[in-house]
Amino acid sequence: MTKAVQIKNRPTGLIILDGWGHREATQHNAIAQAHTPNWDNLLKDYHHTLINTSGLAVGLPEGQMGNSEVGHMNLGAGRVVYQELTRIQKDIDDGRFFENNALVKAIDAASNRDHKVHILGLLSDGGVHSHISHIKASIKMAHDRGAKVYVHIFTDGRDTAPQSALQYIEELETFMKELGGGRIASVTGRYFALDRDNRWERVKKAYDAIACGSAEFEAKDAKEAVELAYARGENDEFIQATVIPRNNGKPARVKDGDSVIFMNFRSDRARQLTEAFIMDDFADFHRCKTPVLSAFVTLTEYKKNFEKFGALVAYRPTSLRNTFGEYVSKKGLKQLRIAETEKYAHVTFFFNGGVEEPNDNEVRILINSPQVATYDLQPEMSLPELKEKLIDAIKSGEYDTFICNIANPDMVGHTGDFNACVQAAEAVDEALGEILATIKAVDGEAIVTADHGNMEMLFNEETGKPLTSHTTFPVPFVYFGKKGYPLKDGGALCDVIPTLLDMMGIEKPEEMTGTSLIDKA
């Protein structure tokens, strides 16, 4: 067993306020308008700076907003991690996408036997889970290889404006018309199709529409499906499953021999629907039909064991050596990861560079997120329980370091409900005050930062409607430590862990190209 190195300031922790961005203006800024005495005192008493969480600084295209997956990958890696969005788009631009082995195999397996190719994906340019340009490329590829293509679209309204689906549908319909192939077969809001919290009754609605052509609603085309949803009071995220029959009046459902291609590049929200299609022993809801597919392709690796069930992976993960978790584990140190359900994958899988298995001496605490339809109904979420568990862990003296995600700013921010966001900010402030007081009492230190912005801007000035997506504003970085070192400006997420290691008195590994933001000059 590796002999543990002796670290300074035990425990030294990282507290990620998910979606807590910085914006000078106070209008439409829930953080600025909330009563946050602990946060105000933290900024008054401790050195702080702002860091970048979007665009090229986190391996995304210039100007692209960051997100939780990207943020936690960059954080845990201590280097800029070039994201799947960028990687796949580059392949499309270079033409390599159209030669991808998994995609070619799936398309040809269906088309050579006169079966159909069904493409699933979140239709938007939000760039968080998917991108419309990728979906268009997959349609073109399947069409050019002789396949008949049906598209099952999931509407966004979360990483985009709440009622923006029609512009993406028009773009896709125009593209398919010019191409001479492709047809939208169903429309479902991401709330149902892309659940990640085991709300299987939601996923079933999407599955039934895609696999069985069965849904509560029907429309003559995708535009009408969205317009009818708006008339029912549903925004894009919550559009109920709607099938669009073919000219013969029958739905274009997935049948035996067809191939399915899931075009989301982010894994966490694509897993549950994928399981319903590929797992023989699936039991989370009754499947109306279980089509025997020629192939099921996941654009990226959604889960290690999915290939055991026959799934093909178009883009395998790039390997990241010496992420924070792996590195401190090699040093013999004990680490804690703690989050509630909505962000659990982020402080584990994504923070570890896409590795599912825990490192040696890596303890994980999962707090169940509340079972409510949307988090504006419970802005405190499960933070009171998370706070108590973390405080107990800090007091126990067991851990050398910890990574904690506080989900409220992002999850409540996505609802666009300003009053609920103010309540969420105040709940975060109260919990943060107690956590930091405990760290101080045991002579520990911490970094308080965020993975991206959200709650600091809740109004879309272009549409005049609530802004429910992330932002490109910088986020705070606070050094909660005893030494009072000033901080360097101009940092990014890749610099956070090198700073944490510096605080622990541990030299960073050579793979980490980020630098410590502590200015000891």
Curated annotation (Swiss-Prot):
Gene3D superfamilies per UniProt: Alkaline Phosphatase, subunit A (3.40.720.10), BPG-independent phosphoglycerate mutase, domain B (3.40.1450.10)
Gene that this polypeptide is encoded by: gpmI
GO MF term set: manganese ion binding; phosphoglycerate mutase activity
Catalytic residues identified in the record: 68
The protein's name in its UniProt record: 2,3-bisphosphoglycerate-independent phosphoglycerate mutase
GO biological process, alphabetically ordered: glucose catabolic process; glycolytic process
Positions with a binding annotation for Mn(2+) 1: 410, 414, 470
Keyword match Lipoprotein: no
Upper taxonomic lineage: Bacteria, Pseudomonadati, Pseudomonadota, Gammaproteobacteria, Thiotrichales
Subunit-level organization: Monomer.
Positions with a binding annotation for substrate: 129, 158-159, 190, 196, 266-269, 343
Cofactor binding notes: Binds 2 manganese ions per subunit.
Origin species: Hydrogenovibrio crunogenus (strain DSM 25203 / XCL-2)
Keyword field contains Metal-binding: yes
